[in-house]
Design a protein with these regions (language model features):
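Acidic, low-complexity intrinsically disordered tails
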Residues: 1, 641-664
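Conserved helicase motor core of SF1/SF2 NTP-dependent helicases
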Residues: 28, 216-292, 299-304, 440
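Helicase P-loop NTPase motor core
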Residues: 22, 26-34, 96, 102, ...
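A basic/glycine-biased coupling hinge at the interface between accessory DNA-binding modules
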Residues: 17-20, 28, 39-209, 234, ...
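N-terminal pre-P-loop "Q-motif" helix
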Residues: 2-16, 221
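Short glycine-/polar-rich loops that comprise or flank the Walker A/P-loop
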Residues: 18, 46-50, 75-78, 232-235, ...
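Hydrophobic residues in beta-strands of the RecA-like P-loop NTPase core, especially within AAA+ ATPase
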Residues: 48, 211-218, 239-240, 573
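Conserved helicase C-terminal RecA-like lobe
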Residues: 156, 354-366, 379, 386-639
């Protein structure tokens, strides 16, 4: 990309007052526009303290902060660049007491929420053979994304009646435990702004200039939040691409970006169409597909780089042949063009497609990484420690309490826990409150009572250690005290003894050491480090960053959703078949259009060359089933100029000949 912004970028960067929509096509430099606009505003005399920039991931926020420091040669004081959830957490920490919560609230991860839902299903006697917690977690997520409170749910069938009841009980328990789930961070901030206009006014005065990245991915709740904040001064600048709106299943509303100028009548619309990533051939093919959508802004992204060669469309006999072909094609490119394997990515619509590619790559000794594999903060040993740390901040957190009350083993068995649960429900109190009265409960055996006594003593002692006195000159040392706690309960021994193999146990110990190293780094980098702030930080990171656990090596294997925002010189899109892409569950025109956007996103990840494969048959339910090529392949071929036609057989023959020559 040029050192200087192009005409359209410059126009967006230098827009100061009033609403702005920057329609940023794939690879058109939208991050540059946001960061340079922030720097421009500050240079023009806007106080950094009055600027709020919101994005979807901590990684994107960190990159923006780094770029702005480079542009301004200093770190602007008071500037807020954060995710939606981090921003709302900041607000709630200061204001949540107005909504009847205490400031030491716990944030539930999605697995914590599912654990709570599972216990609710048992409590209200729902048959979990027919309905599991994942189904009701989906309902609750849908309701919250659409700002529907439990009393506002209008059930249309018996299942939705159960979902409404589960939602009601779930919210009651969360409030009783002084806890929020991830959606509550945004929804309660909206409630706060609506119920307390003076609070909204305070934040409107603070953030007079608002910028939102990836606006096409916002849901109703995020739209409502930003609309409230921007309603006073209307200095809202949003950047996004309607053609890359692929999160409808998470509640994203493409209408938010398509109707921006209807909401803000005097909005300035700037279209960024110069692509600095892909070749002309790749962009022509991608446009031939996406132009079939009706719900989109009319635009065409053009290449600033080389013309390139047309994408390859390859027919394979079946899915094993497809995996074999892609593996050997990568080997061919890596040998003939002297490329390392980090230049290649294989994208697919469904995670289940990765298995055969893994087998094919292992068979040929190819290094690869499956993006989106088991995440660090979801590992058992890490979740156990975090559950304890949550209890040290908020002893009422029932999900954390149930997770570790008998870790390490204290003689508190399932029967004792069930009895305690029944008593807490009967008395209308938290499980922690019931535990405090354990000596007065006859149904608890002596060994369990001893275990409860030891457990409570640990929780109370460390709760006292980590309860921060605002006037204290010195904050409690996190690393030192957490290390001391782990030694006290002999957790390392517990992990080793409960592991199937010594090797597995040692890996878990390494994970614990990694967690402790992270705590030490956090403490070194934050003068006012507290356990509560640390827990909030890593919860947000683990929820928002689903692919960024470690440096990826080798060929990237990932879903198209995981690939958004990334780029690779050589990209393979596997499974270009009817029923896969587009997905067999996408039947309405709206759903097909989202699948088409998904295809467009996948195609525009490629910088130099793109290969699309489809199978003539696949094994389903143990039987070979005939497959039809994706309609998107047909659209692509129809929309391409004649000089971009691909001779498929010639390509495969050339590939096989070159492989044979190299191996001989």
């Amino acid at each position: 990309m040029s050192l200087l912004p192009n005409k359209e970028q410059k126009e967006a960067i230098e827009h100061i007052d009033g609403p702005l929509l920057a329609l940023a096509g794939a690879g058109s430099g939208k991050t540059r526009v946001i960061t340079e606009r922030i720097a421009y505003l500050i240079k023009k005399g806007i106080y950094p303290n009055n600027i709020l920039a919101v994005t979807f991931t901590n990684k994107a926020a960190a990159e923006m902060r780094e770029r702005i420091v480079l542009l301004l040669k200093e770190k602007p004081k008071g500037l807020i660049i954060s995710t939606f959830h981090s921003f709302c957490l900041r607000v709630l920490k200061a204001e949540i007491n107005k909504l009847g919560y205490k400031n030491n609230f716990t944030i539930y991860s999605s697995s914590d929420s599912r654990t709570l839902i599972r216990s609710i299903l048992r409590e209200i006697k729902v048959n979990t053979l027919n309905y599991d917690e994942n189904l009701f977690a989906w309902y609750i997520d849908k309701y919250k994304n659409n700002l529907i409170k439990p009393n506002e749910v209008e059930p249309h069938d018996d299942l939705e009646k159960i979902a409404k009841r589960v939602y009601e009980v779930y919210q009651n328990y969360l409030k009783g435990y002084n806890s929020l789930d991830f959606n509550d961070l945004i929804n309660l901030t909206i409630d706060l702004f609506i119920e307390f206009p003076e609070v909204l006014d305070k934040y409107q005065e603070r953030f007079k200039y608002i910028m939102i990245d990836e606006y096409q991915d916002t849901n109703l709740a995020q739209y409502k939040l930003t609309s409230l904040l921007a309603s006073k001064y209307k200095n809202i600048a949003v950047v996004g691409d309607d053609d890359q709106s692929i999160y409808g299943f998470r509640g994203a509303e493409i209408s938010n970006i398509l109707s921006f100028e209807k909401q803000y009548k005097d909005a300035k619309i700037i279209t960024l169409t110069k692509n600095y990533r892909s070749t002309k051939a790749i962009l022509e093919a991608a446009h031939a597909v996406i132009s079939n959508n009706t719900q989109r802004k009319d635009k065409k992204v053009t290449a600033e780089g080389e013309d390139g060669i047309p994408p390859d469309i390859i027919s394979c006999e079946d899915e094993r042949e497809e995996a074999k072909f892609i593996a050997e094609s990568i080997i061919n490119y890596s040998i003939t063009k002297k490329l390392n394997y980090e230049n290649f990515a294989v994208l697919f619509r469904m995670n289940a497609q990765s298995r055969l590619f893994e087998e094919a790559f292992r068979l040929r000794g190819l290094p690869y990484t499956v993006v989106g594999a088991f995440q660090f903060y979801e590992r058992k040993e890490i979740k156990d420690i975090l559950a304890y740390l949550n209890l040290f901040v908020n002893p009422e957190d029932e999900v954390s309490l149930l997770r570790v009350i008998n870790i390490p083993k204290r003689g508190i068995g399932a029967t004792a826990i069930n009895n305690l649960n029944e008593i807490s429900v009967k008395n209308g109190e938290s499980l922690y409150q019931t535990l405090l009265n354990y000596n007065n409960i006859d149904d608890i055996p002596p060994r369990a009572k001893t275990g409860i006594k030891d457990f409570l003593e640990i929780i109370e002692r460390y709760n006292n250690i980590f309860t921060v006195d605002k006037n204290a000159l010195e904050k409690p040392k996190l690393y030192e005290n957490i290390n001391k706690f782990l030694d006290e309960i002999a957790y390392h021994n517990e992990v080793l003894n409960s592991s199937d193999t010594r090797e597995q146990g040692n890996k878990k110990i390494e994970n614990i050491e990694s967690l402790m190293n992270g705590i030490a780094e956090y403490e070194r980098g934050n003068k006012n480090a507290t356990l509560k702030n640390y827990l909030d930080r890593i919860l947000l990171m683990s929820m928002e960053e689903n692919n960024e656990e470690e440096k990826k090596k080798g060929i990237m294997l990932m879903s198209i959703h995981s690939a958004k925002g990334l780029e690779f010189p050589y990209v393979y899109i596997a499974g270009m078949e009817d029923g896969i892409l587009p997905h067999h569950k996408s039947v309405s025109e709206k759903e097909i259009e989202e699948e088409r956007r998904l295809c467009y996103v996948a195609m525009t990840r490629a910088k130099k060359h793109l290969t699309l494969t489809h199978c003539l048959s696949r094994t389903r339910m143990g039987k070979k089933v005939e497959c039809l090529p994706s309609i998107f392949l047909e659209e692509m071929q129809k929309g391409l100029p004649e000089n971009m036609a691909m001779n498929e057989e010639e390509f495969i023959d050339n590939l096989r000949l070159s492989l044979k020559a190299e191996r001989n």
